Each structure stands twice: as structure tokens, then as C-alpha cells.
Amino acid sequence: MNKKVILMILDGWGKSPDPKVSAIDNANVPFINSLYKNYPSAQLRTDGLNVGLPEGQMGNSEVGHMNLGAGRIVYQDLAKINLAVAHKTLAKEQVLIDAFTYAKENNKKVHFLGLVSDGGVHSHTSHLRGLIDASQEYGLDQVYVHAFTDGRDVDPKSGAKYIHDLQDYIKDTPVKIASIVGRYYAMDRDKRWERVKLAYDLVVNGVGTPSTNPVSSVLESYEKDVTDEFIEPVVIVDENAKPLATIVEGDVVIFFNFRTDRGRELTEALSQHDFHEQNMHKLNLYYVTLTNYDETYQNVKVVYNKDNITETLGEVLEKAGKKQIRIAETEKYPHVTFFFSGGREIPFEGESRILRNSPKVATYDLQPEMSAYELADALVPELNKGEVDFVCLNFANGDMVGHTGIMEAAIKACEAVDACAKKVIDAALANDYTTIVIADHGNCETMINPDGSPNTAHTTNPVPIILVDKQLKNIQDGVLGDIAPTILELMGVQQPNAMTCHSLL
């Protein structure tokens, strides 16, 4: 075979066992429904060991795109760090030993920053507990947690329990919670520096609502209808109404999120650049991140450095002299580039990139179509030219609007994706492209929890694979790692030995 191929990723578009709770099943999506009738389809697993995560762990976009491009199961940081915590080897990591030794010898505070939930997408509470244990093995007595509440990868009002459990865990130690703020502010990834500033001012300047009781502060936020993701800065104070701890020059900061994308902006403000407009100034800190957030950072130490994955789909196509396009809106642009390329920022020879900005709205339920139409309109002329051999396209809507937990908006998101998928696939068929329609993980097919509350998290449901091709009549079930070998078979390019998964044709 010598086909030209489009990989169309419908982000967050899973297969629901219960149509009542599914935005997809409640939406008017005639085109995607017609694909199931007219072309072969099967399902893919995107969770747990199928993608190199711990058993039962829901997949996510970073992991999904990494597996898709790699053509193999990529063992993730979450699984690696879980093992280190379980086997109590975290305290033996040299980077942590050096940080704790520096703190002890120089009488400096240690600040743990990160998302306090067991969502397992950006962080895990077990990792924080492991770090706390390690700090106590070193006899450190000035240890503070700056807790970012989640409400997005876990239920919107689960934060109070996570904070309660953390307090319970540290009650017989000198470790204290120093501040609380929602991830909306502390973990932005869309250059909304005005949000990041609130988190920066909280941890550096102690600016926030003063409190002596972390759990009560979270519960008070719920009473005002502000859920975990959006909790406004809370600074924990002592009996003299002074902040327990802020980050000052020379302190140790350990950012314990293992996923890289949402730790970058706060890290940049604290340690890399001055942002004069926001009055955020970098501090001279002993700064440690659990994984490598960015190769270019100066003076940031990394506990677990990733091995870059070689012989990804992009690299194999480069060697075969093929032209490729990576196309997405801002929210998923790193996924179709950096993650799909196995942790590589630089484009391959023959790779071009099309980016459209995600809409500047507070939350995507306000504009559920996002920038899907702009993506379709940008890609169709390229398909009509017929010069590109492979396209990796991501429609973000099902995931990003699914995360809001608002069913009506998610339905509109699905309908926008349906219309845009039609534009692209009509052009694909007219220009002799084969399209593989898949998702990287589930989300918008489960918008409601069994108790009736909104579900904002990813799921472990299987996702579809549809093979839109004029000749081929079969496709098998598989995992995300099987997609790159499938694409190579369609394109008539030899699969490298490093790709250990197999074609689903």
C-alpha cells in the first residue's frame, strides 16, 4: 500500500456504557454516526497498563499522544514514581538528597508545590506523602506544602477531603500546609499571566484570605459556589496573623507535579524570568522539579529525567522522505507536536505545523466550538493540494468542554466536532486520503456521576477507531500504541524494531 493518511484525534471522545450520561449520545452527530455505518470500526484501550500507566489509571492527552506517536507502550513517570514511593527509594534519589542536605546545612525552608489530588494526571498524593516522608528521614523541620486544589481530574468538591487527609498525614510532624489555591490560577498553561500572578503573590508575598484552618477555608469556598479548580488564594497564618511561610530567596522549592505542561508558568515566574507587567520577579531559589518541565530552564534540578523516545512515527516518516502536518489549537498544540514526537520540540524535516489560538474565554463552556472550524478551514486547502503524506489533527472540544462538567455545552462541542470532521473527511476522500478517526482517552461520554453530580474527569472507557478508506473493510481492536504501525502499513513504510506494537489492519 502507498496511501496518504490523516490521523484525526477526537480528544476526550470515549464509548459510553450509559448513553444517558453521554454528551456524544445526546448530541446530533449525523456525520460521525454515518461513519460507523459505512466504514469498519473497532475500539482502543487508552487506560492503565495499555498505555504504560498503573492498572486502573485513566489515560490523558499527554500519555495518549506519546503512545500514539511512539508505536509502543511508553512507561510513564506516574508508574515509575509510584514504584519509587512503594519501594521507599524516593529518599535515595541524589537530587533530593542534595536539596535536603542544602536545606539542613543552610537552615532553609523546603516548600512542596503541586496539585493535591490522586487524579494521577498531573500529580498524585502518594508522591507528596513520599516526599514528606523523605524530608522527615532527613530531620527537616521547616517543611511547607502549598496545595493546589484540583476539581478537574477528580470531582469538583473533593478538595476538602484531600486537604483533610493531608493534614491527618502530617499531624505528628513539623510539616505544615502554608497556602491553598485552585489549579485555575496555579496551573494555567495558556499564558494567562494575570491568573498565575494570584498564585505567585500567594506563595511569595502571602497575599490571600487569611485562615488558620485549611479544611474550613475549602468548605467556605464551596458555600460560595466556588469549587476546587477555582478556589481563590488562601494563606495559612499563625496566631499573630502572620503567614506561616512564604517563599524567599535561598529557599528550596520542590514542584511535585510529574506532568510537565501545567507546572511551567509558575516555575518561570518563580525562577526563570521577571514579568514586569505583573510585578512578578524571579527569585534565587534551590529549585527542583519531579520531572523535566523544560530543557531550557536555568538552575532547575530534575529528579526524574525522561529518556527521549526515538524512532517515533514523525522520525520514521522524515527518514522515508514524507511530508507531514501537525495541526491543533493552543490547548492541544504541545500534544500533536512535542508529545506525539516522543518529547522532541523541533519539527522533523518535511514537517509543517498549523496552530490556531484557543478562544480567550474563562471556561470553554462559554464557547464550546472552540477553534474547531478554524482548524478544518486551515486543513482543507492543504488536502486539496494533495502534497502532504501524513496529517496529525486534534479536535480539543470533547475533552476541554467535557472538563467543565456542563452537559449542554459538551453536546454543542460534539456537534461542532461532527461538522468539522465532515469538512475534513469529505476533502480527504475527494483527494484520496485514508482517515483514521480515534480518541486519545474518554471524557465527554460520561458527563454525570452515578449520584447525579457533574463528572469533569477523564474515563477508563474504550474509545472508537474508524477506518475511513474506499477499499479496506476491516480494522481490529487494539491500544493507542498500535496506531503508528497501522499508519506505516497504510503508507507502505517499514515499521522499525523500536515500535513493538502492531498494525490493526
UniProtKB/Swiss-Prot annotation:
One of its GO terms (cellular component) is cytosol. Mn(2+) 2 binds at D11, S61, D440, H441. Belongs to the BPG-independent phosphoglycerate mutase family. Disulfide bonds: none annotated. It catalyses: (2R)-2-phosphoglycerate = (2R)-3-phosphoglycerate. The keyword Isomerase applies. Pathway: Carbohydrate degradation; glycolysis; pyruvate from D-glyceraldehyde 3-phosphate: step 3/5. It comes from the Bacteria. Monomer. The active site is at S61 (phosphoserine intermediate). Binds 2 manganese ions per subunit. Keywords: Glycolysis, Isomerase, Manganese, Metal-binding. CDD domains: iPGM. Catalyzes the interconversion of 2-phosphoglycerate and 3-phosphoglycerate. Its EC number is 5.4.2.12. GO terms for biological process: glucose catabolic process; glycolytic process. GO terms for molecular function: manganese ion binding; phosphoglycerate mutase activity. This is 2,3-bisphosphoglycerate-independent phosphoglycerate mutase. Substrate binds at H122, R152, D153, R183, R189, R259, T260, D261, R262, K332. Mn(2+) 1 binds at D399, H403, H458. HAMAP family: GpmI. It is an enzyme of class 5 (isomerase). Gene3D superfamilies: Alkaline Phosphatase, subunit A, BPG-independent phosphoglycerate mutase, domain B. Its cofactor is Mn(2+). It comes from Flavobacterium johnsoniae (strain ATCC 17061 / DSM 2064 / JCM 8514 / BCRC 14874 / CCUG 350202 / NBRC 14942 / NCIMB 11054 / UW101).
